[in-house]
From Swiss-Prot:
Its main location: cytoplasm. Thermostable. Still active after heating at 65 degrees Celsius for 15 minures. GO terms for molecular function: catalase activity; heme binding; metal ion binding. This is Catalase-B. It is found in: Cytoplasm. Its cofactor is heme. Keywords: Cytoplasm, Heme, Hydrogen peroxide, Iron, Metal-binding, Oxidoreductase, Peroxidase. The gene is catB. It comes from Dictyostelium discoideum. It catalyses: 2 H2O2 = O2 + 2 H2O. Belongs to the catalase family. It is an enzyme of class 1 (oxidoreductase). Heme binds at residue 356.
Length: 692
C-alpha cells in the first residue's frame, strides 16, 4: 500500500462491521423505516428530527458537476521513475531510479453531463495527480495533443458552442449540432483539433488504449536553474486503437458505462493499465528550426522532429472504494506544480491556471477543497490560510500571519535550492507593450491539420470523411454546413472537402481571394494508429460461443491459450443455463448472446461442435446477427469443425481474419496474429451489404 492509500485509510469506515445505526450526531436509532406520527394513521410530527435529518442530508447529496469533463472514471496507482532525471528537472518524483510516487488518474469525456454515455465521439480528458514528497503535481491533459482555441478568452465561447444547445438541452454527449460547427466554421484555429476528434482518436476502444498529452509547453528546471521547454506524453503499453463509429453508437445504447466498466474490470482482475510518461525536449536552437510557435496550443511537435524521451511508467492498480468521495471529489488544477516544473507563456495555459482553481470553489464548496481526503498531499503541509467553509484542520497557536514572532516565525519559508528547496518561478526576462494583439506566429491554422490528414492510412481517412459527414449532416442550418466545408475543409485538403461536400450536398465555392497562411509539412507516421499497436493481445476480449454439443477440450484449450497470451475470454451462450458438451462435460456460460453482444468483444470463436449444436446455432437469429455484426465491425472470427458451415450460410467472403479449422490448434496462431492487428481493414470495403 502506498503513502496515499495509507492516508486514505484513516478516513474510511466499514458499515458492514457490527455497529448500530445512529444519527449524524451519534444517537442510536430504534426505528429507521417509519416517521413519527400522531397515531398509526395520523399526521407526521414536525419534531421527528430523525426523519428531518435523513431527508435533509438526502436533499443535499449532489454537488455541481464539472462544467466540462463531467463524465469520467478514476483509479489509484503509482508512477515509477526510470532513472535519475535531475539533469532535466529537479522535480523530486523524477530524481532517482525506481522512485515510486502514488498517483490518481481520471479519464473523462468533455461535452456530456455525468449521465452521458462513454463511447460518444469526443475529446477525452486525461488527468493525473502525483502525490509527490514535495507536494501535489497535477498533469491535466487530454487524449489529443492539440486544443480548439489559442487563447483562454475564447474558452467559455468554445464550451458554450459545444455543449447542449440552450433552447432544448440537446444533444447529450456529442458535437454534431449547429452551435459547434457555427463556432468552428468561424474560428479556423479549431480546424486541427476538430480533425483529431473526427479521426478514430475520438472513439477509443477502451480507456487503457488511448494516449495522453499535456497539450501545452511546460518548463523543466534542473538543479543548476537551467530551463528546458517540454511537451509531455503518456503512451499506453496496451497500444493505441479505436472502435468503429457504428460500433461506438451501438455500445452507447447497450452499455453506456462500457469504458468505465472495462477499466474497472481490468483493474479488479489484476490486468493493470499502464502508460509510459515521456517528454519532448525543446531547447532554443531546436525551436528556431520549427515553422510553428511552441506556445500555440493548436500545434503539436512531430515526433520525427523531436523524439519522446521516456521518463517513467505509471501503473493503475486499485479501484476507488467510493466513487463520490474519490473520483467525483478529486480536484485537478493546472496550477498544482512542484519545484522543477514551471509554466510557459501559452495564453491558453495561462487562463487554465486560474480557471481550474476557480471552478473548485463552487463545485467543492469553498477554498478548503484541498483538505478533502483524496486531494490532500502526502507530505506535511502548513500555511497561514485559515477558516472558510468545511475547514477540517484545527490550527493551534496564536499567529496566522507572516512575519510573526509569537509562534517563533512558523511556518517558516524554505529557500529555493538545487534539491528539495522552496518553489520559485523561473526568472524569465519579460518585456513588451500592453495589448490584446495575438502573435503573428499563431496565424497558421491549416498546415498541421493537413499534416495530420496526410499522416493517416486510407482506412483512417475514410473514417474521417464519414465522421464529418455524420456530424455536419446533423446541422439544421444550410449556411453552417456550407461555411464549414468552404472555410475549413477546403483549406485542409481538397479530397477531404470534395467527398464531404458531395455527401452533404454542399457546393464548393470558388477559392477565396483572401490568402491563408500555410506551408508544406511532412507526414508524421507517429500520428497513425496502426503504427501504435502493442503487437500483443493483452487485455483484448474474446467471446467463445457455446451451445449443447460443443467440444469441451476445444473450448478449454482455446481459452487457456488465449488467457496465457493476456486476453480475457468469456463463454457466451443463448442462456445462462449450464451447457452439456459432446462428451457429457458441463460448462457454465458467463454471459448471454443478447446481454453480451459482439460489440463488447474484440474477436469471436465458435468452437468445434456436434451437428446438433451446429443446427441450434444455424437456427438462432440472435447468433447469426452476432456473427454478421462482428464481421461488419472487421473483427477476427474463427469457426472450428462442422460449425464452419455457418460461414457459407451467411455468405461471408473469405479474408485473413475469418478462420476455419478442425479445432483450436488449426487457428490459434492465425487468430493471435489477426487480433494483434486490431481489425481486418481489408474487409472494410466488402461489408457495406451486411445487414447488421
Amino acid at each position: 500500500m502506498n503513502k496515499k492509500l495509507e492516508q486514505l485509510e484513516k478516513f474510511k469506515t466499514n458499515d458492514k462491521n457490527p455497529v448500530y445505526s445512529t444519527t449524524n450526531t451519534g444517537v442510536s436509532l430504534s426505528d429507521d423505516a417509519n416517521s413519527l406520527k400522531a397515531g398509526p394513521r395520523g399526521p407526521t410530527l414536525l419534531e421527528d428530527f430523525v426523519l428531518r435529518e435523513k431527508i435533509t442530508h438526502f436533499d443535499h447529496e449532489r454537488i455541481p458537476e464539472r462544467i466540462v469533463h463531467a463524465r469520467g472514471t478514476g483509479a489509484h496507482g503509482y508512477f515509477l521513475s526510470y532513472k535519475d532525471h535531475s539533469k532535466l528537472t529537479k522535480a523530486d518524483f523524477l530524481s532517482k531510479q525506481d522512485k515510486k510516487t502514488p498517483v490518481f488518474i481520471r479519464i473523462s469525456t468533455v461535452q456530456g453531463p455525468r449521465g452521458s454515455a462513454d463511447t460518444v465521439r469526443d475529446v477525452h480528458g486525461f488527468a493525473v495527480k502525483f502525490y509527490t514528497d514535495e507536494g501535489n503535481y497535477d498533469l491535466v491533459g487530454n487524449n489529443m495533443p492539440v486544443f480548439f482555441i489559442q487563447d483562454a478568452s475564447s474558452f467559455p465561447d468554445f464550451v458554450h458552442a459545444v455543449k447542449m444547445e440552450p433552447q432544448n438541452e440537446m444533444p447529450t454527449g456529442g458535437s454534431a449540432h449547429d452551435t459547434f460547427y457555427d463556432f468552428c466554421g468561424l474560428k479556423p484555429e479549431s480546424a486541427h483539433s476538430v480533425l483529431w476528434v473526427m479521426s478514430d482518436r475520438g472513439i477509443p476502444i477502451s480507456l487503457r488504449h488511448q494516449q495522453g498529452f499535456g497539450v501545452h509547453s511546460y518548463r523543466f528546471i534542473n538543479q543548476e536553474g537551467k530551463s528546458t521547454f517540454v511537451k509531455l506524453h503518456w503512451k499506453p503499453l496496451s497500444g493505441t486503437c479505436s472502435l468503429l463509429w457504428d460500433e461506438a453508437q451501438k455500445i452507447a445504447g447497450k452499455d453506456c458505462d462500457y469504458h468505465r466498466r472495462r477499466f474497472w474490470e481490468d483493474i479488479e482482475s489484476g490486468d493493470f493499465p499502464q502508460w509510459e510518461l515521456g517528454a519532448q525536449l525543446l531547447d532554443e536552437d531546436l525551436q528556431k528550426k520549427f515553422d510553428f510557435d511552441i506556445l500555440d496550443p493548436t500545434k503539436l511537435i512531430p515526433e520525427e522532429l523531436t523524439p519522446v524521451i521516456p521518463l517513467g511508467r505509471m501503473v493503475i492498480d486499485r479501484n476507488p472504494d467510493n466513487f463520490f468521495a474519490e473520483t467525483e471529489q478529486v480536484a485537478f488544477c493546472v496550477s498544482h506544480v512542484v519545484p522543477g516544473i514551471d509554466f510557459s507563456n501559452d495564453p491558453l495555459l495561462q487562463g487554465r491556471i486560474f480557471s481550474y482553481l476557480d471552478t473548485q470553489l463552487s463545485r467543492l464548496g469553498g477554498p478548503n477543497f484541498n483538505e478533502i481526503p483524496i486531494n490532500r498531499p502526502v507530505c506535511p503541509f502548513a500555511n497561514n490560510q485559515r477558516d472558510g467553509i468545511h475547514r477540517m484542520t484545527i490550527n493551534k497557536g496564536g499567529a496566522s500571519y507572516f512575519p510573526n514572532s509569537i509562534d517563533k516565525g512558523y511556518p517558516l519559508l524554505k529557500e529555493p535550492s538545487a534539491n528539495k528547496g522552496g518553489f520559485r518561478p523561473y526568472p524569465e526576462n519579460i518585456s513588451g507593450t500592453k495589448s490584446y494583439d495575438r502573435s503573428e506566429t499563431f496565424e497558421d491554422h491549416f498546415s498541421q491539420a493537413t499534416m495530420f490528414w496526410n499522416s493517416m492510412s486510407q482506412h483512417e481517412k475514410n473514417h474521417i470523411i464519414a465522421a464529418y459527414t455524420f456530424e455536419i449532416s446533423k446541422c439544421s442550418r444550410p449556411e453552417v454546413r456550407t461555411r464549414y466545408v468552404n472555410n475549413i475543409l477546403v483549406n485542409i485538403d481538397s479530397v477531404l472537402a470534395e467527398k464531404v461536400a458531395k455527401n452533404l450536398g454542399v457546393k464548393i465555392e470558388p477559392t477565396s481571394t483572401k490568402p491563408i497562411k500555410k506551408i508544406m509539412v511532412k507526414p508524421s507516421p507517429a500520428l497513425s494508429q496502426p503504427n501504435l499497436l502493442s503487437g500483443d493481445i493483452v487485455s483484448r476480449r474474446i467471446s467463445v460461443i457455446i451451445e449443447k454439443g460443443v467440444d469441451y477440450d476445444d473450448v478449454i484449450n482455446f481459452k487457456d491459450d488465449m488467457e496465457k497470451r493476456g486476453a480475457m475470454v468469456m463463454l457466451v451462450s443463448s442462456t445462462l443455463a449450464q451447457v452439456e458438451c459432446s462428451g457429457g462435460e458441463m460448462l457454465s456460460p458467463k454471459g448471454t448472446i443478447i446481454g453480451n453482444p459482439s460489440i463488447f468483444f474484440d474477436a469471436v470463436y465458435v468452437p468445434k461442435s456436434t451437428e446438433e449444436a451446429t443446427k441450434i446455432l444455424s437456427d438462432d437469429g440472435n447468433f447469426l446477427h452476432y456473427i454478421l455484426e462482428a464481421f461488419k465491425h472487421l473483427k477476427t472470427i474463427a469457426f472450428g469443425g462442422s460449425v464452419s458451415v455457418i460461414k457459407e450460410l451467411l455468405r461471408l467472403p473469405q479474408d485473413h481474419g475469418l478462420l476455419l479449422g478442425n479445432g483450436y490448434k488449426d487457428i490459434t496462431e492465425q487468430f493471435f496474429y489477426s487480433l494483434a492487428h486490431h481489425r481486418v481493414w481489408e474487409r472494410e470495403s466488402k461489408v457495406s451489404k451486411i445487414p447488421a
